[in-house]
């Protein structure tokens, strides 16, 4: 048994963990105070003994928050996050496909003019992805009210609805 701590920013908060199909664990976390001071999405991989294999931060130029991620296959993962612009009070869902080495395969953003956020993502049987979250950019004209938001993508992260 073991206990470890990891960090790349001033404050790091673990948010999700998956067992890697190649052994060890993948951890997604929120990073505060890294780079230009914005919040970023952190991802790290450790072995079964808790030794760090690699650690990366994504985002950096805009505030981001990690939400959830899922295993796609033995060496790929899908993560849903939010990109937040506090000056315009808006946000977009941010979908990132990552390989086992923490390299981004592709990334897509979804949303319009208001607050759109993805909270959960799973792979679908047709090799695409489905995201659920919240939106006040759709039919709703009240910026203080949100609708349940569901978005389906193809295997490359494209959606005909956004």
What are these regions (language model features)?
Residues 1-162:
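A sequence-level/structural motif corresponding to short, flexible coil/turn segments enriched
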